[in-house]
């Protein structure tokens, strides 16, 4: 009788544990989906203000995924596991978030920008990075750290001729290097 009761209790506990695990997994998936949705909404707001179609962010996201996948196949130098690749791809959607702080006349100007206007346009990298630095308690979250790298340094160039900091080679985080390639390709 005691053994029977213990087996029954163990089976009930196991079933309850499986239900709880299933609930927690569903909640985690919902949280991840909502986070991804908010990032895409925010990036589309910036694109809308910038007069773009909304496809640039999607292209950057997909190109970043593809480039990271290939890079991970070619080298282990950057430790690009699946979760890291997914996080970089998601953060890539925020690469131009700093454009929200650039004057609309410059953002939407038809034709070539003047030298002064281009200097103002270049500030979007620093503006985006500063916006992310001001997120308080979220500042140290891995996604925010990667988004910060991408925002600030996605216009850096391997030869040091990029902006805003003139970083050279592997001084540029791999997240920003990959998004830079995707951004130039989709320009």
Cite the ranges covered by each PLM segment.
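Generic low-complexity, intrinsically disordered sequence content enriched
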Residues: 15-17, 24, 46, 75
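Histidine- and acidic-residue-rich, metal-dependent catalytic cores
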Residues: 33-187
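Short, charged amphipathic alpha-helical "coupling" segments at sensory-output junctions
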Residues: 22-37
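N-terminal membrane insertion elements
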Residues: 1-22
């Amino acid at each position: 009788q005691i053994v029977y009761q213990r087996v029954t209790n163990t089976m009930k506990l196991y079933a309850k544990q499986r239900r709880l695990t299933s609930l927690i997994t569903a909640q985690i998936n919902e949280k991840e989906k909502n986070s991804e949705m908010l990032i895409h909404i925010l990036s589309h707001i910036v694109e809308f203000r910038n007069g773009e179609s909304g496809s640039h962010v999607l292209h950057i996201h997909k190109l970043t995924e593809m480039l990271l996948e290939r890079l991970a196949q070619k080298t282990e130098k950057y430790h690009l596991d699946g979760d890291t690749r997914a996080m970089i791809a998601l953060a890539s959607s925020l690469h131009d978030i700093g454009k929200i702080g650039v004057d609309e006349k410059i953002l939407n100007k038809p034709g070539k920008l003047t030298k002064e206007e281009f200097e103002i346009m270049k500030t979007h990298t620093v503006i985006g990075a500063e916006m992310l630095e001001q997120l308080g308690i979220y500042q140290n979250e891995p996604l925010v750290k990667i988004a910060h790298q991408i925002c600030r340094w996605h216009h850096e160039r391997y030869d040091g001729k990029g902006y805003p900091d003139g970083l050279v080679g592997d001084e540029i985080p791999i997240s920003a290097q990959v998004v830079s390639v995707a951004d130039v390709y989709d320009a």
